[in-house]
Design a protein with these regions (language model features):
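N-terminal flexible segment immediately upstream of the FAD-binding catalytic core
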Residues: 1-66, 82-111, 259, 263-267, ...
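C-terminal substrate-recognition/cap domain of FAD-linked oxidoreductases
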Residues: 30, 239-395
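FAD-binding subdomain of flavoenzyme oxidoreductases
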Residues: 106, 121-122, 126-246, 252
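Short, well-ordered beta-strand elements within core beta-sheets of diverse protein domains
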Residues: 51-56, 222-227, 279
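Glycine-rich, charged/polar anion/phosphate-binding loops
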Residues: 37-38, 159-163, 191-198, 208-212, ...
Length: 395
C-alpha cells in the first residue's frame, strides 16, 4: 500500500511506541461490527487504516494525537470493535488508536469504580465483585469481548437497563476524562450536564482515557427461560415482571416465534416452532417472588433455570441471547438477516408492538427488551429481526 508523506512522517515520529506493522492486524483493527447492516456492509467494507498504534498510558495518547494533528492524519479510536453502527471506522484511513493496553481498574469501592477505557466489561466485574461485592449496573451483551470505554463511547444501554435505564440518564456515568486532538491536546474532565458532550460520541470529539462509573450490588443471577404460545402473554410476562417492585431483574427479553426454534441452537430442542420465548435474569433472593408470580400465571412455562435444570447442555448466559446477540445468532443461520431499532414508549408500548406486527405480518420477527424509560416507566426497546431484500424495502 502506497502511503502519503503525512502518514509516513507520523509513523516515523511514533516509531518508538507500539506501532503495528502487520497488514492483517491493521485490517482487523480497522473494522467494527458494521456488517450487521447490509447497507453499511456495501459502503464500509473496503475501509482500512494506514497504521495502528497502541498507547500504554495517557501520556502516549497525548503524544499520538499531537503528532497526528501536526501531520493532518485522521485518528479512529478502537476499543474491541464490537459496535455495529459503523461509528468507529477509518473513513479517511490514517491511524487507528487501539486502547487495549490501557486496561487497568484504578480503584473500586461499593457503589463506584474508576477504570481505564481498554478494560473489558467482564474484567471490570471480575475485579470489582471480589474486591467490593459490586458489579457494573449495565453492560452490552458483548460483555465478554467489549471494552468499558467502547460501551460508554458507543453504547446506549443494555443488560441492566430494565432496572437502571439508559446510559444517558442522570447518575449512570459519574465522570469521564478526555484528551482532545488539537495542536496542544488538552486533558478535560466531564461531570454532570457536561457528560452528554462526550458520552456516546464514539471518540470523535476526544479520546476517553479514564472513566468513573456507578456500581450495583453483585448477585449470582439465576438465568431463566419462559415460553408461551400466546404472543401477548409472552410480551406481558416481561412487562409485568419488570414492573414488580419486589422482584429484581437484570434483563427481560421477549423473542417472537420462531426465533428460539430457528436461531437459538441450544434452546431449540426444548421448544416448539410456535413457542415465544422470554429470557430473564433474576436475583437469587427474588426467585421465590418470581415463582409465586409464575404460579399465578399457569399458562406460562418455566423451561430453564440455571440453578436447577436437566438440560443435556447448558444454554450459557441468558443475556448472550438478548440485545444485539439475537441478531448475531440469527446471522449465523441466515446471513440475510438484519434488524430494525425501535423504541416503544410507555404507556402504549404493547399496543404499538402489535400495530407493528399487524402492519408487517410474516415479514418482521419481534425481539423486545424491557427497559426503564426516561420517566422511570417500563417500555420496550425493539431490535426487530428482518430478512434483507432491498434497501428501498428496508427504508
Amino acid at each position: 500500500m502506497i502511503q502519503s508523506a503525512n502518514v509516513v512522517d507520523a509513523k516515523l515520529a511514533l516509531s518508538h511506541l507500539d506501532v503495528e506493522e502487520k497488514q492483517t492486524a491493521i485490517t482487523s483493527a480497522s473494522r467494527d461490527f458494521f456488517w450487521y447492516s447490509p447497507v453499511l456492509k456495501s459502503r464500509l467494507d473496503h475501509l482500512v487504516a494506514d497504521f495502528l498504534v497502541r498507547p500504554k498510558d495517557e501520556a502516549e495518547v497525548i503524544e499520538i494525537l499531537k503528532v497526528c494533528y501536526a501531520n493532518d492524519v485522521a485518528v479512529t479510536t478502537r476499543g474491541a470493535g464490537t459496535g455495529n453502527y459503523g461509528q468507529a471506522m477509518p473513513m479517511r484511513g490514517g491511524c487507528v488508536l487501539h486502547l487495549k493496553h490501557m486496561d487497568k481498574v484504578i480503584h473500586c469501592e461499593p457503589g463506584r469504580v474508576i477504570v481505564q477505557p481498554g478494560c473489558l466489561l467482564k474484567d471490570v466485574d471480575a475485579y470489582c465483585i471480589p474486591a467490593c461485592g459490586h458489579e457494573l449496573r449495565m453492560f452490552s451483551s458483548t460483555w465478554a469481548t467489549a471494552t468499558i470505554g467502547g460501551f460508554i463511547a458507543g453504547g446506549s444501554g443494555g443488560v441492566g437497563s430494565v432496572t437502571w435505564g439508559s446510559l444517558r440518564e442522570l447518575g449512570n456515568i459519574i465522570r469521564l476524562r478526555v484528551v482532545t486532538m488539537e495542536q496542544e491536546p488538552r486533558v478535560l474532565e466531564f461531570t454532570g450536564e457536561e457528560l452528554a458532550r462526550v458520552s456516546h460520541a464514539y471518540g470523535t470529539n476526544g479520546i476517553i482515557t479514564e472513566l468513573e462509573l456507578p456500581l450495583a450490588p453483585a448477585y449470582n443471577w439465576i438465568h431463566c427461560f419462559v415460553t408461551s404460545k400466546d404472543w401477548d402473554r409472552a410480551m406481558n410476562c416481561a412487562d409485568e415482571l419488570a414492573n414488580e417492585n419486589g422482584i429484581l431483574l437484570k434483563i427481560a427479553s421477549v423473542y417472537e416465534s420462531p426465533t428460539a426454534k430457528s436461531y437459538f441452537q441450544r434452546v431449540a430442542p426444548y421448544v416448539d416452532k410456535e413457542d415465544h420465548l422470554v429470557g430473564l435474569m433474576v436475583a437469587p433472593h427474588s426467585m421465590e417472588g418470581f415463582l409465586t408470580w409464575l404460579n399465578r400465571n399457569s399458562d406460562l412455562n418455566l423451561i430453564y433455570r440455571s440453578d436447577n435444570h436437566n438440560w443435556d447442555r447448558s444454554p450459557g448466559l441468558v443475556f448472550e441471547y438478548g440485545w444485539n446477540h439475537t441478531t448475531l445468532r440469527a446471522l449465523k443461520v441466515d446471513p440475510n438477516i438484519t434488524y430494525l431499532q425501535v423504541r416503544y414508549g410507555f404507556p402504549d408500548h404493547q399496543r404499538l408492538v402489535n400495530e407493528m406486527r399487524g402492519a408487517f405480518p410474516g415479514e418482521l420477527i419481534q425481539h423486545l427488551e424491557a427497559i426503564r424509560m426516561d420517566d422511570g416507566k417500563v417500555g420496550f426497546a425493539g431490535l426487530t429481526l428482518v430478512k434483507f431484500t432491498t434497501e428501498k424495502r428496508l427504508d
